[in-house]
Amino acid sequence: MFTLKKSLLVLFFLGTINLSLCEEERSADEEERRDEPNEMDVDVEKRFLPALIGIAAKALPSLLCKITKKC
């Protein structure tokens, strides 16, 4: 009976250590996630700006033609 209690106590102790390590990893992951939205904004800007430049490049000649009336 004593060995059973002792082994259960050891398992409980090891389990609490594992849980505390998992919580530390979670908090580190949460800190990394806080940084990710900024990176996502940069990715969105990288995707948005080339599309905007492409649209402007297509529309600019016709706009200049209409303004200067030299078509």
From Swiss-Prot:
Q: In which tissues is it expressed?
A: Expressed by the skin glands.
Localisation = Secreted
One Pfam match: FSAP_sig_propep
Major location (coarse): secreted
Q: Which residues form the propeptide?
A: 23-45
Q: Where is the signal peptide?
A: 1-22
Report keywords, A-Z.
Amphibian defense peptide, Antibiotic, Antimicrobial, Cleavage on pair of basic residues, Disulfide bond, Secreted, Signal
Give yes or no: UniProt keyword Disulfide bond.
yes
Disulfide pattern: C65-C71
Q: Which family does it belong to?
A: Belongs to the frog skin active peptide (FSAP) family. Brevinin subfamily.
Function, as annotated, reads:
Antimicrobial peptide.
The entry's protein name is Brevinin-1P
Its lineage opens with:
Eukaryota, Metazoa, Chordata, Craniata, Vertebrata
